Design a protein with these regions (language model features):
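Short amphipathic, positively biased membrane-proximal segments
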Residues: 1-200
Length: 200
């Protein structure tokens, strides 16, 4: 969330500009230029935010840089950074007013749990030695999305759903070779929207 006195509109405009550039480069396969745009995403978004939100975004920024690489070590580093980021988001989201939606309407969690179970069942035989790290990561991701839903704020809940979408697209591509046309563009479009909505 914005802190009082934050840069507000200018920071939001800067993030939108960097995000639009990176999504365009991702969709057109210009990986080299993305070494300039992708590392700027989270540092731009965290300007003027509260401390807990900044921590979650900073961990996302570490993951962004790690995943510019293509080695197994880069993937592991990115996975670890984003897992820590999801845990940080859970802490940040719990401080927001209006939480408690799931206590009143627990059935709202069912689609999230079904998506988590279905994706893991599909990926389990395909992830090899990564299956336990992927399971741990997906559990943290689902918990973060449910925490976002529990705030009772539609935009925040949408951010959680979009993050689920982002990482589902990534997992299906990496482990099952399932991808959309301009796949990386869709991944980044959902990702930058997710982080922006969670941070708003």
């Amino acid at each position: 969330m914005w802190q009082p006195g934050g840069m507000g509109e200018r920071a939001a405009a800067a993030y939108l500009a960097v995000a639009a550039a990176d999504v365009t480069l991702a969709a057109t396969g210009r990986r080299g230029l993305r070494r300039l745009t992708k590392p700027l995403l989270m540092p731009t978004l965290l300007i003027g935010r509260d401390r807990l939100t900044q921590r979650a975004l900073a961990l996302g920024g570490v993951g962004d840089v790690a995943l510019l690489g293509s080695s197994p070590a880069a993937f592991t580093a990115g996975l670890g950074a984003f897992l820590a980021g999801h845990l940080a988001w859970i802490q940040a989201l719990r401080t927001r007013q209006g939480s408690g939606l799931l206590r009143r309407h627990p059935a709202l969690a069912l689609p999230y749990l079904a998506a988590w179970a279905g994706l893991n069942a599909y990926l389990w035989p395909r992830t090899g030695r990564d299956r336990y790290p992927v399971l741990a990561y997906s559990t943290a991701l689902a918990a973060m999305a449910l925490t976002a839903l529990d705030t009772g704020k539609p935009a925040t809940a949408a951010g959680g759903v979009l993050f689920l979408t982002t990482d589902s697209l990534l997992a299906l591509d990496r482990f099952a070779r399932v991808e959309l046309p301009r796949h990386e563009g869709w991944v980044m479009a959902t990702y930058v929207a997710a982080q922006g909505l969670l941070a708003a």
